[in-house]
Amino acid sequence: MSIKRSAVHTLALLAAAIFGVVLLLGAIHKDIGFMQMAAVLAVLAIGLFLLTLATAFTTKERLFMAVIYILIACTFLNNAFFAIHLGFFSLFLYRLLLIAAGCLHIFGMVRNRTHIERWHGLQVKGILLFFAFWFIYGLVSLLWAKSVTVGLKYLALLAMGIFFIYLIVMYVQKMERLMIVYAIWLVMTVFLMIIGFYNHITHHHLASSTLYSGPEYKQHYPTSVFFNQNDFATFLSISFFFYITMMKNIKNGYIKAIGLVLSLCALYLIFATGSRASLLGIFAGIAVYIFIVLPPVLKRMAIWLSAAGIALFAVLFASKIYSKFWELFLAPQTLHSFHDRLPSNVARANLLKNAWHFFLDSYGFGVGAGNVSYYLEHYAVYDTDNVAEVHNWLVEILANFGLFIMLGYLSVYAYLIWVLYKFYERKLENQSKLITEGLITAMVSFLVSSISPSSVSNLFFHWVFMALVIAAVNVLRRSRQMPEPMYR
């Protein structure tokens, strides 16, 4: 089956499944308790019936991959359309599907040994082992955490993200499957942007948004299915480059036009959110994109010119940079009226200073999984206007898990960019260039824009993105050893 036909079949199944589930859940949206649980049981019963019926017409592997693709698509819906609150934990559609996929995976491991062969064939075992070590370290960190409950909730999110990465990397080991995952991201982004434009034009938001029944002056911010506009903007800062690379590397003129329109839509919505960090991420990604497409001679010139430009900027604006740094991070804290909110830059600087204080106080080991928010709420040294999230992904990792885990994550991130870039230099065909260009630029953009959301740990698209990147590196490495099977 060709890649195009397989993608069309998968996306058709995906659209039908999501549409059916949304219709079913929409019918009982206003009910709670018994009716909500009955609806879940009905969905599961229908799902089991369809799985049983499907096994008669397809192979188990294709069936499992269909579950994986639907799972990937449902991660983009977050908890916007359906959620079961179990007190300390909530079940969303993608969490139910992740549990189902996990059970099917374990059942398959018991039945045959193909999973061992899959594992031996992986070219990214070290990266997966780092994520496993991260989770184990998080468990150990509960020994000194102030709040074990908060730590367990955080580790549950971390475990789901890591297990999702493992599933995708284990089963997406062919270029055909990788392109389907890429296509799912592109299609689901269109769906989320439609909701975003609806928010922006009508000033109506989904119940999962903080702007639902929020202040009138914020109603024009698009949030789509996300908690707030910053989360949505960070997501779009990734999708923007996927559309740009699609426009560049696909020869079909209609698809090029669609890619251009969708990239402009994503850029407009980022402007509409007012997220400065996401705009900086876009600029950083564009700068890197221009660099990687330059000829080798011009690349060297670009590096020297960039270094000279940065040095000149630092010299010309050294006093202003230092004074601003002093004002935000070194100057003694000044009192302000509790009736007035802190300026956003001062509040964010205080969040970083608090996190740094907690990190030093823990001797570099971190305050324990998820506990930086607990510390900000109960032990903040600097005023944050009662904000209890760091608003910086790398600093969040540093404060929660310590220096070693943060440097490990950053090293893995940089290593993935480097490997993708080295593959890009090998003059790949358009399909692989689309993947490498899109992922490199999106990774740079996300690294910058990740200072915008309050926390990245609960943004599941981050784990989908990391799974896509790691799976791409694995596929490209395997294609170097066994080129034919990877591109069938």
Swiss-Prot record:
Signal peptide: none
InterPro entries referenced in this protein's UniProt entry, alphabetically: O-antigen_ligase-rel_domated, WaaL-like
Superkingdom field: Bacteria
Topological type in the membrane: Multi-pass membrane protein
Pathway(s) this gene product operates in, as recorded in its UniProt entry: Cell wall biogenesis; teichuronic acid biosynthesis
Cellular component GO terms, alphabetical: plasma membrane
Keywords: Cell membrane, Cell wall biogenesis/degradation, Membrane, Stress response, Transmembrane, Transmembrane helix
Transmembrane segments: 7-29, 35-57, 64-86, 91-110, 122-144, 154-173, 180-202, 222-244, 257-274, 279-298, 303-322, 354-376, 397-419, 459-476
Keyword Nucleotidyltransferase applies: no
Pfam families cross-referenced by the UniProt entry: Wzy_C (PF04932)
Induction record: By phosphate starvation, via the PhoP/PhoR two-component regulatory system.
Subcellular location: Cell membrane
GO biological process, alphabetically ordered: cell wall organization; teichuronic acid biosynthetic process
Any further remark recorded for this protein: The nature of the anionic polymer present in the cell wall of B.subtilis depends on phosphate availability. Under phosphate-replete growth conditions teichoic acids are present, whereas under phosphate-depleted conditions, at least part of the wall teichoic acid is replaced with teichuronic acid, a non-phosphate containing anionic polymer. The synthesis of teichuronic acid is accompanied by degradation of teichoic acid and reutilization of liberated phosphate for other cellular processes such as nucleic acid synthesis.
Function: Might be involved in the polymerization of teichuronic acid repeating units after their translocation to the outer surface of the membrane.
Record protein name field: Teichuronic acid biosynthesis protein TuaE
Protein's organism: Bacillus subtilis (strain 168)
